[in-house]
């Protein structure tokens, strides 16, 4: 154990100083797909938690920062659709009606643009039955809907750290 600890800093230093060779071959894109670079909104950090295409072809993103952004592909333009959410990490858009749902830390929320200005002005709590604590690692991820209309997501659970994990 002592040898490992004395060698580790040297190995780490070497790894940080010696750059790894760059990959010379470009990534292969599967048939039927294309890659496109999309610039993010200026001054905005997009910690993307969910992505979904709307029926109009626009790309919607929800972020850990609690925002939902809409990217108009043809115009190459970003619009903020919703903000003030609590770590929105999953998004589902109805392919027929464009109804937009987001899962945030404590609930599934339906976002509605009631006046047609491109911004959600109604945040309707659709389901908030699972509870939430103040633990940093308690997240709600992903959002899918089955053919019967049921939503599914993934919940992280909080954990009292680290009493049980410490060795004596």
Task: Locate predicted features.
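Beta-propeller blade termini and top-face loops
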Residues: 23-168
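N-terminal secretory signal peptides that target proteins for export/translocation
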Residues: 1-3
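Bacterial N-terminal signal peptides
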Residues: 6-19
């Amino acid at each position: 154990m002592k040898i490992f600890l004395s060698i580790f800093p040297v190995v780490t230093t070497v790894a940080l100083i010696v750059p790894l060779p760059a990959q010379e071959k470009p990534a292969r894109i599967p048939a039927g797909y294309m890659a496109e670079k999309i610039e993010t909104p200026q001054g905005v950090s997009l910690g993307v938690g969910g992505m979904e295409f709307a029926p109009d072809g626009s790309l919607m993103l929800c972020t850990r920062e609690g925002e939902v952004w809409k990217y108009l592909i043809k115009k190459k333009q970003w619009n903020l659709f919703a903000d003030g959410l609590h770590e929105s990490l999953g998004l589902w858009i109805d392919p027929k009606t464009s109804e937009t749902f987001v899962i945030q830390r404590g609930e599934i929320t339906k976002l509605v643009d009631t006046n047609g200005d491109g911004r959600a002005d109604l945040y309707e709590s659709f389901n908030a039955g699972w509870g939430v604590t103040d633990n940093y690692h308690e997240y709600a991820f992903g959002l899918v809907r089955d053919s019967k209309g049921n939503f599914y997501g993934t919940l992280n659970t909080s954990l009292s750290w680290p009493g049980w994990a410490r060795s004596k």
